[in-house]
Amino acid sequence: LCKEKIIIGSFPVLFFGFIFYDHISSNLRSIEIISIFTILIALVLLMVEYFGKNKKDITDITNIDILIIGLFQSIALIPGTSRSAIIIIGALLLGYNKKSSIVIALILAFPVILLAMLYEIYLFDFQLINIDIVSKSIIAIVISFLVSFYVIKYFIYYINKTGFYPFMIYRIILG
């Protein structure tokens, strides 16, 4: 995806996240909401995978499609909603194949997670920061990046073999 499409796909969640941050933080963090959305996303993913006709490739993505996928990503602001799963659902509904849907979810993860982290740092009490916390955070970020880089290839291979069914079952049990 080009930078323009990444910005378009990231804008809705950043916009709605900024507007509804306080409401979400104070009103939607109950165990009931989290459980309901954990199960609901699994069931929606099941239906989309079962009924989807997924032929489009990531190279076919339009600005409108990436904006719609970005709007789907906004649903992930609700606790219990997997950001990756909701993007995959949106992409599958628009006719993209599994591999492209996963790649779109992974590409859109970076700006959103980075900006969310920066916003949380902005809200953080800086008196609590010390060199130990900073060094451990940097190590965690580097390790996460490296592990993610190697897992992505396996994940795409695995999903193409099994589909999303193991993850649906996991989410239903978890919910």
Predicted regions and their residues:
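Multi-pass membrane proteins that catalyze or facilitate reactions on polyprenyl-/lipid-phosphate substrates
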Residues: 1-175
